[in-house]
Amino acid sequence: MSLLVDTSVLIDHLRGHPGARAVLEQGLAAGEVHASEVTRLEVLAGMRPREEAPTRRLLTSLHWHPLDDAVAERAGELGRAWLPSHGGIDAADLAIAATAVLLEARLLTLNLRHFPMFADLARPY
C-alpha cells in the first residue's frame, strides 16, 4: 500500500525524531511516499532559515499531488460528512484526507483527531 505523509511526520523527521526517520526511510525504500501540496505549503510556511537546506532535500524525496478539482470535490464530500460531528477539522486536513482517499494510500499522521474519516488510523510511531 502506498503512503501519504502529513506535515506532523515531516516536521518530526526534520527535528530528528527516530520514529519519523524510520517510517519515512522504510516507506521510501519500499516505493514512493506521497504528499499533498497542502503539506508542502504547511512545511514551507513554518520553515526557519537554518532549516531550509534539509527541508528542501526532504521535500525532493516525496511524490507531490496538487489540490485539483478531484481533490476539492472529495474534500467537500468529506467535509459535509464529518464537519457536523467533528468541527475541528480544517480545510487543509480535508484536502490531505481527500488526497489519501483518492490515492488509496495509508495516511501517516500524528493528528489522529483531525482525520476521523479513517477508522483504522493509528500513530505511525
Regions from the language model: what does each represent?
Residues 30-32, 61-63, 101-106:
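Short active-site oxyanion
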Residues 1-35, 44-57, 125:
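Short, well-structured N-terminal submotif of metal-dependent ribonuclease cores
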Residues 20-21, 40, 52-55, 72-75, ...:
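A general structural signal for well-ordered alpha-helical segments in protein cores
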Residues 63-85:
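Acidic catalytic patch
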Residues 97-125:
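Acidic, PIN/NYN-like endoribonuclease modules and their adjacent C-terminal/linker elements
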